[in-house]
Amino acid sequence: MRALPGAGTVCDTAGVTERSRENRHPTGRGPRAGSVSAASRAVRHRRLAQHALSHNISDMNRSVPTDSQVSLDAIVGISDSDLMISQPYRLYVERLDPSRNMARYYAMSIEPNLFGDICLLRKWGRIGTKGQMMVHHFGQEEDAVRLFLDLLRQKRKRGYRPRPSLPKEKWPAEAEHESATSAPVPDPEGHLDLDEERNLDGEL
């Protein structure tokens, strides 16, 4: 706008009209094609970026517990059977001799650990005390069962017997295992008396 003496203010529309004319299509129907194509490219790039981002999030990090749409953390195919053993061997026996002030317990179990190994857990001590514990790791369940049966034979020969059934609340804290193996114990072939061949359990 410019002021004219004695004529008030007059709008200078010539420049605005000229710029509008330059930005319009030669036919006079709308903006030039160059400005339209630039805007279209910007929108297209933005949509492609959003699609790529959502695609990456969907393919990575899927986890049902943390997202109902399964958009985080892919699920690892591990079934419960991968960590199971064929027969859960468990044993709890005691050796009591009042004349010698002897009251000992011995517990064993075969269980898998989180890394897929088979473990033989042994726990022993005086009844009413925390006692000691030892864990043996095996790659095959058969090896763990073999040692379990060897130690069972040894304990029977030393006078260990299953504890008589008592109410649960009267059992010592160490009696966390059942009083007998969960499956019949087969008679292993050959002579496996550890008291004569070797002493793997000299602590008792």
Curated annotation (Swiss-Prot):
Which residues lie in Basic and acidic residues bias regions?
166-179, 188-204
What are the WGR domain coordinates in residue numbering? Answer: 88-175
Q: Where is the composition biased (Low complexity)?
A: 28-37
This protein's UniProt keywords: Plasmid
Question: Region labeled Disordered — which residues?
Answer: 1-37, 159-204
PROSITE patterns from the UniProt entry: WGR
Write down what this protein is called. Answer: Uncharacterized protein y4dW
